[in-house]
Amino acid sequence: NMVVYKRRKKDSILPSTVIASISYTQKSQIIFPFQSVIYLRHNRAMLISDWRFLKYPSITYGLGMHSNPANENLLDFQYLKFHESILFQLAPNVYAGGGYSLDYFWKVREAFPHVTPVTDFEKYGYMGHTLSSGLMFHLLRDTRDNPINAYSGTFANISINPRLKFLGSDANWNTLRLEWRGYFRFPASSSNIVALWSYNWFTLGGRPPYLMLPSTGWDKSYNTGRGYIQGRFRSNNMLDGEAEYRIRLTKNGLLGMVLFGNLESFSEINTYRFESAAPAGGLGLRIKLNKYSRTNISIDYGWGRQGSRGFFVNLGEIF
């Protein structure tokens, strides 16, 4: 479920959002997320929460862009995530702050161990459990007219997340995330929107656990790389760019459609070099659930390289 909270219609406080659900899939996965962005003190501060529990048997395909879909490897694991940050307003629409992150994986195992050839998971370093504990530092600027379904504005975020042994982490390592989104009416007189998204995820130092490496569909909303299954590509650095053309089909906005394309690249695990990229594209349907918050259901079908394809469903816009 998604809840959007704004105290009064003319209230200057930005809308807060809370997303919580629990689901059980046909692949015996249990997914329990709680995510929220709460604005405090007349927009002078914001509290960002991202808590999750996953029991998540899922497929990985190896490391780098040259991984083969035929070499799928089923991993089973349980995952507890606790990320909590508070940001303070520096200027209109600009916030900076920090917080704490905990990522704990346990009961990590291959469904079919000791197969030949040896999997990239085993080569990288098999670990049955990992603990990553550290600090987070954020700088963001958000001029979107609506954080759930923007018609105009931009969003930019820089996030640095060092994991530190003195906070209980198994090892010292560091990640950097750079994100930008933009929304523009096109044509200017229409209600159609061009939406752009850049999501980039880098390992700055150290050696993250295998399941904490940048990977397709493992962004905060599990949405990067439509056209490819989650976990299709994985390595130490990731570049992802996406574009959508959002078309209103009915005057009241109940129905809409989307044409989308994306391009992502992952560095080679040993050289850190980007050598190739994976394009994908597709189209989708939008069904409006709430005209005030603009919440909708997104149902997309995407195609990627090497025969990759599938449906992708989301509550709210993809980005």
Segments predicted by a language model, with ranges:
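Gram-negative/organellar outer-membrane beta-barrel architecture
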Residues: N1-L131, M136, G231-S235, R294-S298, ...
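Hydrophobic, lipid-facing positions within transmembrane beta-strands of outer-membrane proteins
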Residues: I30-F34, Q78-E84, S133-F137, R141, ...
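Transmembrane beta-barrel strands of outer-membrane/channel proteins
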Residues: V18-Y24, S49-P57, G62-M65, G98-Y104, ...
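Short glycine/threonine-rich loop-to-helix capping motif typified by GTGT followed
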Residues: A171, I269-R273, F311
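Outer-membrane beta-barrel transmembrane domain signature
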Residues: F105-K107, A111-S133, S189-S191, G217-D219, ...
